[in-house]
Curated annotation (Swiss-Prot):
Homodimer. Its EC number is 5.4.3.8. It is found in: Cytoplasm. GO terms for cellular component: cytoplasm. This is Glutamate-1-semialdehyde 2,1-aminomutase. Its cofactor is pyridoxal 5'-phosphate. It comes from Janthinobacterium sp. (strain Marseille). It comes from the Bacteria. One of its GO terms (biological process) is protoporphyrinogen IX biosynthetic process. Keywords: Cytoplasm, Isomerase, Porphyrin biosynthesis, Pyridoxal phosphate.
Amino acid sequence: MSSKNDQLFARAQLSTPGGVNSPVRAFRSVGGTPRFITKAEGPYFWDADDRRYIDYIGSWGPAIVGHAHPDVVKAVQDAATRGLSFGAPTEAEIEMAELICRLVPSIEQVRLVSSGTEAAMSALRLARGATGRDKIIKFEGCYHGHADSLLVKAGSGLLTFGNPTSAGVPEDFAKHTLVLDYNDPAQLENVFKEMGDSIACVIVEPVAGNMNLLPATPEFLQTMRRVCTQYGAVMILDEVMSGFRVALGGAQSLYGITPDLTVLGKVIGGGLPVAAFGGRADIMRHLAPLGGVYQAGTLSGNPVTVAAGMATLKLIQAPGFYENLTAQTTKLVHGFSAAAREADIAFCANSVGGMFGLYFASEVPVSYDTMMKCDKTRFNAFFHAMLDAGVYLAPSAFEAGFVSAQHDDAVIDSSIKAARAAFAQLADDCDD
């Protein structure tokens, strides 16, 4: 007899391509039936068969304070009673912009949009408009949304599907995008020496969360900052994932790097669709209505999403919030690593703030190439063993995981116990 999840997936595929509204949700990489979620609270969510899971995707990052936090829910309810959307400015937008600028000092001015893709796309257009140049640099395996010029050897879902690029991206778009190796400062410097005067910007994830978890090295970021300044290119940090996730000031505060522009999302919406891009005021002044770079959005600064974001940003400013979040994430990855050693499984893990990566390899990957050598078959087996035990990990070997403030010791201990059994099962399967 099929489960309710099976029935819903079959039904969804009749009206929605692949049965999902974002590819990774289809479980194509790991196999099996996607779980259709009915509710979530704290560190848990429940599927259509009323099965509870410890959630380690957290809506792919936004649920940093846990699902359905009472303060966030109340803020949304209160805002909704005053109107869902106005298409006109509100005081709440100003307050959110002021708070972002205060928490992220490199951002002097900021504009709110509705998605990370929109924010990254707009930041690129702004950089091109401000510099009068066309070429951009991105890095293999990094994902900055699905805008055409950025789907060139992109990470995330495209890695999951084994495609280096997306169909439908014209050659004329791609030719202006230079794709370099992540964490290779020498290559970056050489490219600038060859064509620095034609490069508008460099965009990078300081903590790449779309080829599992791969932090940038200090030398890589420092070289990037230096050559961008030297050649007049705009340095863009894509902190859609790491912003307010790894530290209150984002990854840039951890690494001591000051970008020209920053892209934010996920956490700043508290679970609702909102993103932002901002940075130096002299660059931001190129945006319409002040300058010639056009950007607009019907739902930009939506009052309900802003309310959810402001409530979340207030909660994460609590004393000790990030220390506790980091400690719990560290406890999780150390526990998983110890369990793998007990089973003699080649495995390692890493974390930054509330983000973590799991690698079926003997050493933590430091580049796209080493990441691609991780054992995806073993990851898939581990994923399903954990899923059967009620622990929901990212359904792809190329996606980072997320811990929330509601993942207490009991939740972490339960997850480690499940991992110990899963690794033992993998070891038994190898012996057979």
